Swiss-Prot record:
Disulfide bonds: none annotated. Belongs to the UPF0225 family. Gene3D superfamilies: 3.10.450.50. InterPro entries: NTF2-like_dom_sf, SEC_C_motif, UPF0225, YchJ-like_M. It comes from Escherichia fergusonii (strain ATCC 35469 / DSM 13698 / CCUG 18766 / IAM 14443 / JCM 21226 / LMG 7866 / NBRC 102419 / NCTC 12128 / CDC 0568-73). The gene is ychJ. NCBIfam families: PRK01617.1, PRK01752.1. This is UPF0225 protein YchJ. It comes from the Bacteria.
Length: 152
């Protein structure tokens, strides 16, 4: 029986993010890197997360913290709701909602991630957390107000 990819693509894992996590292929664009990094969180693959974080972020020394974070977090879903590339094609942005449960408490990360391309490979560099009003539509696309959805 095949397993769907945790990134939410509705494609089998073996045909989707597994090729990136295994190192057989590089993610071709920021959206695929975002999806594969989410899958790495679900699959508890600290090596892939560190490998795809830009070296200037100095996350290699945070390996133990990353692994410790896996123990109490269950990832529930990813929604990518916007993405863009700069005109030179060397910087990309991906806006997403990642839902999770930590120690039984629901949460969501809403971020506009920045990725850079160096030597043909995309890397996560940082992200910003956009602010939403409680009565704004939720960016996840549910049609609900933010306060009744990801803003809880």
């Amino acid at each position: 029986m095949s397993q769907l990819c945790p990134c939410g693509s509705a494609v089998e894992y073996s045909l989707c993010c597994q090729r990136y996590l295994s190192g057989n292929q590089l993610a071709p664009d920021p959206v695929q890197l975002m999806r594969s990094r989410y899958s790495a969180f679900v699959m508890k693959d600290a090596d892939y997360l560190i490998k795809t974080w830009h070296s200037s972020c100095g996350v290699a020394q945070l390996r133990d913290d990353i692994i410790a974070g896996f123990a109490h977090t269950e990832w529930l879903g990813l929604t990518v709701f916007d993405h863009a590339l700069t005109t030179d094609g060397k910087t990309g942005y991906v806006s997403f909602v990642a839902r999770y449960s930590e120690r039984g408490r629901a949460g969501a990360i809403i971020e506009r991630s920045r990725f850079i391309k160096e030597n043909g490979q995309w890397y996560y560099i940082d992200g910003t957390r956009p602010q939403f009003g409680r009565n704004d539509p939720c960016p996840c696309g549910s049609g609900k107000k933010f306060k009744k959805c990801c803003g809880q």
